[in-house]
C-alpha cells in the first residue's frame, strides 16, 4: 500500500511541475507579446525631463528651452481651438497663465508630421493636458488618443458644467474648423 501512495505522489508532483512550466511559458509569451504596449503605457505616465517654458503658441502647442535650443511640444490627447477660432485666445491664455516661465516635466509620446514632440506635460505633478480638457479649454482628440477615455470623461463633465468653451452654444471642434477653412480656400 505504501508503494501506491508514493507512485501517486510522484505522478502528482510531475503533473504540478508540468503545469508550472506551462504557466511560466504562457507568462513569458504574454510578456513578450504585450510588453511593447505595456511599455508605451508606462512611458506615457512617467515624466522624463524638466524644461523651462519659453512661450505658448496656442492651447495645445508650446515651446520649451532644451539646453539652449528650442523644442516645440504638441500636447497629447487634446485639441484646443485655433487662435482665430471662437475661444482660441481664451484657451491659449489659460495655458499661458498656468505654465508661463515655469519649469514643467515632460513625457514624450511621439513626433507629429510637423516635427513637434507629442507630449504630456506636468506642472507640480498635475497633468496639464487633462487640465485643459477638464476646465473646458480643449477637446478630447479621439482620433489620436482613442484609448485614453479619461479625456472623454473630463470633456463630458466640462460640457455638463458648461465650463470654458462649453459655455458657448455649439462650439466647433478644431478639426472641423481646420477642415472648413481648407475647403474655403
Regions found by a protein language model. Name each.
Residues 2-185:
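Small beta-barrel nucleic-acid-binding modules, primarily SNase/OB-fold domains
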Amino acid at each position: 500500500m505504501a508503494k501506491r501512495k508514493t507512485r501517486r505522489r510522484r505522478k502528482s508532483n510531475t503533473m504540478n511541475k508540468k503545469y508550472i512550466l506551462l504557466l511560466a511559458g504562457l507568462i513569458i509569451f504574454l510578456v513578450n507579446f504585450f510588453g511593447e504596449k505595456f511599455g508605451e503605457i508606462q512611458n506615457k505616465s512617467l515624466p522624463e525631463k524638466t524644461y523651462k517654458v519659453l512661450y505658448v503658441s496656442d492651447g495645445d502647442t508650446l515651446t520649451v528651452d532644451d539646453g539652449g535650443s528650442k523644442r516645440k511640444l504638441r500636447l497629447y490627447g487634446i485639441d484646443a481651438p485655433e487662435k482665430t477660432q471662437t475661444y482660441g485666445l481664451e484657451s491659449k491664455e489659460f495655458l499661458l497663465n498656468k505654465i508661463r516661465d515655469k519649469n514643467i516635466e515632460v513625457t514624450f509620446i511621439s513626433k507629429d508630421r510637423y516635427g513637434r514632440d507629442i507630449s504630456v506635460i506636468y506642472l507640480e505633478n498635475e497633468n496639464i493636458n487633462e487640465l485643459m480638457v477638464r476646465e473646458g479649454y480643449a477637446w478630447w482628440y479621439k482620433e489620436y488618443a482613442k484609448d485614453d477615455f479619461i479625456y472623454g470623461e473630463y470633456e463630458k463633465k466640462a460640457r455638463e458644467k458648461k465650463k470654458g468653451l462649453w459655455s458657448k452654444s455649439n462650439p466647433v471642434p478644431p478639426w472641423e474648423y481646420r477642415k472648413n477653412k481648407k475647403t474655403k480656400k
